Amino acid sequence: MPGWSCLVTGAGGFLGQRIVRMLVQEEELQEIRALFRTFGRKHEEELSKLQTKAKVRVLKGDILDAQCLKRACQGMSAVIHTAAAIDPLGAASRQTILDVNLKGTQLLLDACVEASVPTFIYSSSVLVAGPNSYKEIILNAHEEEHRESTWPNPYPYSKRMAEKAVLATNGRLLKNGGTLHTCALRLPFIYGEECQVTSTTVKTALKNNSIIKKNATFSIANPVYVGNAAWAHILAARSLQDPKKSPSIQGQFYYISDNTPHQSYDDLNYTLSKEWGLCLDSGWSLPLSLLYWLAFLLETVSFLLRPVYNYRPPFNRLLITVLNSVFTISYKKAQRDLGYQPLVSWEEAKQKTSEWIGTLVKQHRETLHKKSQ
């Protein structure tokens, strides 16, 4: 597929930015369009550096702006759609999450049809498949099981419906008479340098005598390193354009993980940060069943207050379930169809992430030093 081009939505985000950085290394790629709505100054500087390369074009626009999407898609060979409102807690309104994740995806699919873009890769989530209960044990989930989330919460619901829309659009006729081919990648928790969840966890711990609060003691999960998650998207874009590989990939979804050890989220946080003196809270924790029912009570209070006050609980049943479930996935189908193998080993991913956490610790200490002067 010589001379191909690619649009990446959500290019200012954690995953999207890494995909753009890796696409720059693709020798046969003629043009990369990086579409974003908002991002921090650091991300802006990095994308600006990438823009100095002839094949990177940075675009600012909204995933809900149909005309913007049509312009962004014009002349592209492929679209990698990572833009999303990632909000399991429901901090944003239900309508906002549905608009960004579902309506935005539908608008982008329509833009691909109008602009005759033949390849569409969707960044989905394992939450479209579960876990539905913290009592359920799921080990090495695979695509043939056809698991489906039953949560009504806007984030898993919107991602599930958006994935269905993407896969259902496979085979749709393009304006130029061609055919749109789609696939979806279901991603678990993504960690690595610049991960906002990890950053918040570390900064909170540093304000608490370097003690990491335990929130996910009972979980067993297999998170994926951001570099490997990005690599899977590039392989999917390549494979879906390959006449030999494409027929078996069209309309399919794939679980993506790597060789990160299966462990609790608490243990992952500790493993990545222990070099810098952070440790897990050794105090007593509430029983999981009690936490779950407390979350139910808080959700009930939020619902009853809704007509007069917008109360957002600090946690909900979905979050308690996700953070405390035994839910692991297998990426064998991605290995078979996409030729996916993790680029970055666990040891290297751990080292890179730990070094980045070290910069957060250093910044915190410098801030404390300035305040004490």
Swiss-Prot record:
It is found in: Endoplasmic reticulum membrane; Mitochondrion membrane. The keyword Lipid metabolism applies. One of its GO terms (cellular component) is mitochondrial inner membrane. Its EC number is 1.1.1.270, 1.1.1.210. The chain crosses the membrane at residues 288-308. GO terms for biological process: response to stilbenoid; steroid biosynthetic process. It catalyses: a 3beta-hydroxysteroid + NADP(+) = a 3-oxosteroid + NADPH + H(+); 5alpha-androstane-3beta,17beta-diol + NADP(+) = 17beta-hydroxy-5alpha-androstan-3-one + NADPH + H(+). NADP(+) binds at G10, A11, G12, G13, F14, L15, Y155, K159. Expressed in the male liver, starting in late puberty. It is a single-pass membrane protein. The modification N6-acetyllysine is found at K350. Belongs to the 3-beta-HSD family. This is NADPH-dependent 3-keto-steroid reductase Hsd3b5.
